[in-house]
Amino acid sequence: MQYIFKLPNKYTFEKESIKGTNFESKELSDKAKFAVIETETGHEARIREKDCDFHYYILEGKGNFEIDGKIEECQKGDLAIIPSGSIFKYSGKMKLLLMTIPWWRPEQEETF
């Protein structure tokens, strides 16, 4: 069984103005999903995640998160927590570690 997951050296997804890499760890644990996301400008479409809480840890850079209409600045070392059902977007040049609880699936997401 694999317990250590290396960051893949190529992107596994791209959408809007973000690109990222998923850690393929579901076989070991399907309770949380992890991805590293990079963006030059942010994610301008508003998102509502119906089933997952999103936890974004800012690895590099700075920007803003708008969560349920409230805008807050963030920078390297900060953690943004978005509860399921909240509407959010983010802007700025950042590298983020995303943890979703439970495991994220595309059909759970609405964009505006």
List PLM regions with ranges.
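A short, N-terminal "cap"/entry segment at the start of jelly-roll beta-barrel domains
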Residues: 1-36, 46, 111-112
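A short beta-loop-beta micro-motif enriched in histidine and acidic residues
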Residues: 25-33, 39-57, 67-68
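Short acidic-glycine-tyrosine-enriched beta hairpin
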Residues: 68-85
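Ligand-binding loop in jelly-roll beta-barrel domains
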Residues: 84-109
